[in-house]
């Protein structure tokens, strides 16, 4: 069930344009389901079920209902045939970046499980978790995502480490991320060129009322600062800090130094800086100017 034999019996040549790499390792499949902490009230969205190895595990779990979305039409045919007898499973053909994310039986989806194609990781994270400037269309309580290890390390990175980036700031302001397990390339069929990692993401139930109001400014601030991640803050945003008393007070209060680099600043401090900037600065021609 869901292992090597199942994958081989389901005849389908992987398509590179869809980024198809099917997880075959039973241990990893079990860890994904365990991390989702499924109970009889849960309605799960599975992204890209492929040949159904993880789908079968989800159906066997305590989850109330599984709604899957698959883009590959040939796989859709095979999946419908394989799981046609399952009344707690429904399959929608479509692109996860644009398809409806609700369950076809009217239930509210509260959890997501996905083996993310590497080529759509960024856009999919935005759709499922939201953006600094825009709340997500659907609010999920837990997401268990299998993704490229390099990207996962950035989601999990702490300030001051080499992997901490603008993506780290964005995601950590929106959700709590937890490492589940590493997934070597040999766990897939066909094996990708890079390793993967499973991450559990729990979006915050409540967001600061000012969050989305300053989100656009925060995005521009992060882009501006992390474009020169090896540069000290005084060389990227120092000009408007030293000329703005309110921003200087914020730096002093939070213990931030212009000799620090962008990856050394915590997500909460980046948000606080954006709030202070919104009151005192505007962006003109890509640079920050005092009002």
Swiss-Prot record:
Please name the top-level EC class of this enzyme.
transferase
- One short Pfam name that applies is RrnaAD
Which keywords annotate this record? Cytoplasm, Methyltransferase, RNA-binding, rRNA processing, S-adenosyl-L-methionine, Transferase
Q: Which GO terms describe its cellular component?
A: cytosol
Q: Which residues bind S-adenosyl-L-methionine?
A: 21, 23, 48, 70, 95, 115
The catalytic activity, as recorded, is:
adenosine(1518)/adenosine(1519) in 16S rRNA + 4 S-adenosyl-L-methionine = N(6)-dimethyladenosine(1518)/N(6)-dimethyladenosine(1519) in 16S rRNA + 4 S-adenosyl-L-homocysteine + 4 H(+)
Task: Write down the InterPro entries for this protein, in alphabetical order.
Answer: KsgA/Erm (IPR001737), rRNA_Ade_diMease-like_C (IPR023165), rRNA_Ade_Mease_Trfase_CS (IPR020596), rRNA_Ade_methylase_Trfase_N (IPR020598), rRNA_adenine_dimethylase (IPR011530), SAM-dependent_MTases_sf (IPR029063)
Q: Which family does it belong to?
A: Belongs to the class I-like SAM-binding methyltransferase superfamily. rRNA adenine N(6)-methyltransferase family. RsmA subfamily.
Summarizing the function annotation, the protein's role is: Specifically dimethylates two adjacent adenosines (A1518 and A1519) in the loop of a conserved hairpin near the 3'-end of 16S rRNA in the 30S particle. May play a critical role in biogenesis of 30S subunits.
Q: This protein is called what?
A: Ribosomal RNA small subunit methyltransferase A
- In the UniProt record, what gene is named as encoding this protein? rsmA
